[in-house]
Curated annotation (Swiss-Prot):
The gene is trim13. One of its GO terms (biological process) is protein ubiquitination. This is Tripartite motif-containing 13. It is found in: Endoplasmic reticulum membrane. The C-terminal transmembrane domain is indispensable for the localization to the ER. Pathway: Protein modification; protein ubiquitination. PROSITE patterns: ZF_BBOX, ZF_RING_1, ZF_RING_2. E3 ubiquitin ligase involved in the retrotranslocation and turnover of membrane and secretory proteins from the ER through a set of processes named ER-associated degradation (ERAD). This process acts on misfolded proteins as well as in the regulated degradation of correctly folded proteins. A zinc finger (B box-type) spans 87-129. SMART domains: BBOX, RING. Residues 186-236 form a coiled coil. InterPro entries: TRIM45/56/19-like, Znf-RING_euk, Znf_B-box, Znf_RING, Znf_RING/FYVE/PHD, Znf_RING_CS. GO terms for molecular function: ligase activity; ubiquitin protein ligase activity; zinc ion binding. It comes from the Eukaryota.
Length: 404
């Protein structure tokens, strides 16, 4: 068609010939184009010879009316214009240039002659376009009802459930992140790195929640969009009377329907399981972790086996030694108080002799001296406790400075 249009184009205006006139040199031009050239060369006293725009051959200027009409060329142009406005037959995608003029009744597709004889449709049943049009017209109504009655309400309900579950999950994760932030704001700056690390884990969990729900949500939205497009396509060609156009649109409509029907719906059990996996946690569980084990803190949704496996805190060796000293002192104080006061100034041998000569005190004196010993032991315990506390604070501060 493009090559034919070149031969039907006027060399002057570059448009299809309109009332073509032929010169003596056999070249044809539009009547209006020739009139424009002659009007430009017209003089009141003298008319120069007219030269052909193509071959430059001179022609006697006797006016446009004297030129013959090219009836053959005008008829060809008129037929070309009628053919150009007619709908073009679709061509086969597999065999270039071959028109789709056969309908395969087995695969329900438009095919070309090569497809029917040598392609995948060899041996299938074929029918004329008019017959196929009547069959597919009946099948269209049934397929339209299938698409129209597709479980759109169920998809909308499922989509709302997914969005609601996603919102609840993200809100729960956000609340947990806030609680984690509040907890770590109360700690020393040595815990800042761990706080950021756990918040990063929570952000990763948010991403995991979105990666879990978003694909299903997007897939269902795409299915609804495909349903809408299929209905629009169906509404646009359900009243077509041209068999070729109807069958071609029917083929696209079947593809849309196949995509819609192949979209599975997620089960509510999967949604409930995804939401139940985000269990609540209590930040007070971290109170059991000692400062030297901060790096072993578990994120809220990680395994808490570490906390349950922590051994009970053993008393520091320094504290155990102090208590032993206290017990020895408490045991010796009663004996020292029972000795005569002048015995303390004697030599070791004299003390032995003095011990052999003193008598046991009365029960009242024993009770009085026991009370005195208890007060002395309590004072010593208070002093040692204060000493231990100061030592532990110094140890914690030193460790904190070392970690920071």
């Amino acid at each position: 068609m493009e090559l034919l249009e070149e031969d039907l184009t006027c060399p002057i205006c570059c448009c299809l010939f309109e009332d073509p006139r032929v010169l003596p040199c056999s070249h044809s031009f539009c009547k209006k184009c020739l009139e424009g050239i002659l009007d430009g060369n017209r003089s009141p006293t003298w008319r120069p010879p007219f030269k052909c725009p193509t071959c430059r051959k001179e022609t006697v200027h006797n006016g446009i009316a004297s030129l013959q009409v090219n009836y053959s060329l005008r008829g060809i142009v008129e037929k070309y214009n009628r053919i150009r406005v007619m709908p073009r037959m679709s061509q086969c995608r597999v065999h270039s240039g071959q028109p789709l003029n056969i309908f395969c009744a087995t695969d329900l597709k438009l095919i070309c002659g090569f497809c029917a004889t040598t392609g995948d449709h060899k041996g299938h049943k074929f029918c004329a376009l008019e017959e196929a049009y009547e069959r597919e017209k009946l099948a269209f109504e049934e397929l339209f009802r299938v698409v129209e009655g597709w479980k759109g309400a169920e998809v909308h309900s499922c989509l709302e459930s997914l969005e609601s579950a996603k919102k609840k999950a993200l809100e729960r994760v956000s609340r947990d992140a806030d609680r984690v932030s509040e907890y770590f704001d109360k700690l020393l700056r040595t815990l800042e790195h761990k706080r950021s690390e756990i918040l990063s884990d929570l952000e990763t969990l948010k991403l995991a929640v979105m990666q879990t729900f978003d694909p299903e949500i997007n897939r269902l939205r795409s299915a609804l969009e495909e349903q809408r497009r299929a209905l629009n396509i169906a509404e646009s060609f359900r009243s077509l009377s041209d068999p070729l156009t109807f069958l071609q649109q029917m083929q696209d409509f079947r593809e849309k329907l196949r995509v819609i029907q192949g979209t599975p719906l997620p089960s509510r059990t999967d949604m409930d399981v995804s939401l139940s996996a985000l269990q609540s946690f209590d930040v007070k569980e971290w109170d059991r972790v000692r400062l030297g084990q901060v790096d072993k803190l578990c994120a809220p949704y990680e395994s808490s086996a570490y906390l349950s496996s922590l051994p009970p805190a053993a008393a520091p060796r320094f504290t155990r030694v102090m208590w032993r000293v206290v017990l020895v002192v408490c045991a010796c104080l009663p004996a020292l108080n029972f000795l005569p006061s002048d015995c303390l100034a004697l030599s070791f041998q004299d003390k032995v002799v003095a011990l052999g000569g003193f008598s046991l005190p009365s029960p009242g004196e024993i009770v009085r001296w026991l009370g005195f010993c208890w007060k002395e032991a309590a004072s010593i315990c208070t002093l040692l406790t204060e000493l231990c506390r100061n030592c532990m604070l110094d140890l914690i501060n030193t460790t904190s400075d070392f970690i920071s």
